[in-house]
Amino acid sequence: IEPMMHNGVALQGGTSHYFGDGFAKAFGITFTDRENRIRNPYQTSWGLSTRSIGAIIMTHGDDNGLILPPTVAPIQVVIIPVAQHKEGVLEEAGEIAATLKANYRVKLDDSEQSTGWKFSQYEMKGVPVRLEIGPRDIEEGNCVLVSRVTREKKIVPIANVEAEVGAMLKQVH
């Protein structure tokens, strides 16, 4: 099976190999058949799993990295505190994370990396939704959602963040 990827490249989708009884003999693998005779089994090998991962990467990506469907993304929403050293930012980000974790796979990145580095890192990893929150957002009662697919930013009220994240994730296939 060799499905064609969107860029015209064929990907070997699955393989099967018939090994006969050679490996069974070499490793002393035996069984007793219905007539009570000792036999060596005939063996086969089948492969698909790692090729499936390759197909996802080839199909769901662009020049900036992966674009993972929410169903397979290990992280569905990354929360990036902007100016996290400012009072209240990490606390608000943590509260949003706790709310979203009830229904989504969420990561709150409170590392010391720069905000730009974090944006790039999670875009490359294919995280479907990025949530940005900083002091000005908190003051206004909002946060910013960014879609990995469209790269569009949407300012949403913190009170509606769970519904807005759900709607954004549904737009990604």
Each language-model region and where it sits:
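NTP/phosphate- and nucleic-acid-binding module
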Residues: 1-173
